[in-house]
Amino acid sequence: HPEVNWQWHHLPLSMHEPAATAGARLAECAGETGGHATFWQAVAWLYAHTRGDGQGLPEGLRYPDLTPAMQGCLDSDRPDAVIRAQAAEAAQQGIAATPALQLRDRESGKTLLLHGPVEGDALLSAIDLLAAGSTTAAEPAHSPDMPAGVAGDMPR
């Protein structure tokens, strides 16, 4: 979608610690030292190799593209400050679980929060809803054919 900038915000959940913060630190340091493409490469690698239920990476497995600059970042407090700030922002916005997508229209300032995994069509519909400048994004229209309880708060 041409009007979209994708931003990742870390939200390590306590049930996935310490692996969640370790992964977030690696991704942050990859981005700090190598830019956006390196950040996303690290995120993809982490998702491909991380075990579920907060177990993290298998014992002895190391990020293959670790550079001295990345190691210097990992040895510092810099990634922790970014992760803490992003987690605090999420808490302030009422986001307490992952995945969550917050869509923000840069022109109008309107936001739409989608909880849980979001299918591609639903994401595109939500983006289109914000891009259309609809004033009813927060209040779905109701008709006699669709009772209020059925509409919910998800974009359709």
PLM feature spans:
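Structural alpha/beta surface segment adjacent to cysteine/selenocysteine redox centers
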Residues: H1-P64, A96, D128, G133, ...
